[in-house]
Amino acid sequence: GELVGAFCRNKNHIGKDVSEIIGDGFPHVGVAVENSADTDRRMGELKPDVCIIATRSTVAELEDIFTICAKHGVNAITTCEEALYPWNSSPAITEKLDKLAKEGGCTLTGVGYCDLYWGTMVTNLAGSSHKITKIEGSSWYNVEDYGIALAEGHGAGLSIEEFNKTIGCYNETPSDEMKELVESGKYVPSYMWNQNGWLCSKMDLHITSQTQKCIPCVDSV
């Protein structure tokens, strides 16, 4: 593949060769980072086949760049966790983007850790099973290994009181009310919310109810 453009809103990165941003002695590429404000215009000029988006974690935050890609018929792939299956968390935005993508003849999709370890690995094992009565999973990862968007979504740096008032404020909310809060955009669910939707869609299952609890973990040191 050939890199034809790179965009960022960080003023400290604009104008630098992408190799400087990558670091670790990466060879000179010859492509300078441009201001993200110019993405729409430059996308039309460059006409890339694919746009890789590695910025934020919700579809609402990526609506603008997704719209730009669809407008220019550019396939977009992103590490945005919600984008793997946003139909059960941001249905209105997703339907809008889906329509734009079809009109533009392109694909907008989310990939990454989720689609393998929380997705296809599960469906592959399920497909080899004669009978399934329950699927249970656990996942651990170091928030520091990822970007600021993931850290914010997990409440990193918040006090217990702040966490309970923001992220954990709906822990006791009934399933039907939680569904309304999520789909209206008033509350951003955990990544597992979308993952459950993805798994059920792949296994031809219908979600009757879904709840979540966000419990803070505090370092004892």
Show which residues each predicted segment covers:
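Short, ordered loop/turn segments at secondary-structure junctions
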Residues: 9-11, 56, 80-84, 113-114, ...
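Conserved active-site and cofactor/substrate-binding residues in soluble primary-metabolism enzymes
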Residues: 46, 64, 92, 96, ...
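Short, hinge-like loop/turn segments at secondary-structure boundaries
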Residues: 20-25, 95-97, 126-128, 153-155
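Active-site-lining helix/loop region of Rossmann-like oxidoreductase modules
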Residues: 127-221
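Adenosine-phosphate binding glycine-rich loop
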Residues: 104-132
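N-terminal glycine-/serine-/threonine-rich beta1-alpha1-beta2 phosphate-ribose binding loop
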Residues: 1-71
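Rossmann-fold NAD(P)-binding glycine/threonine-rich loop
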Residues: 61-63, 67, 71-72, 80-106
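General beta-strand structural signal in soluble alpha/beta enzymes
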Residues: 78-79, 108-111, 136-137, 209
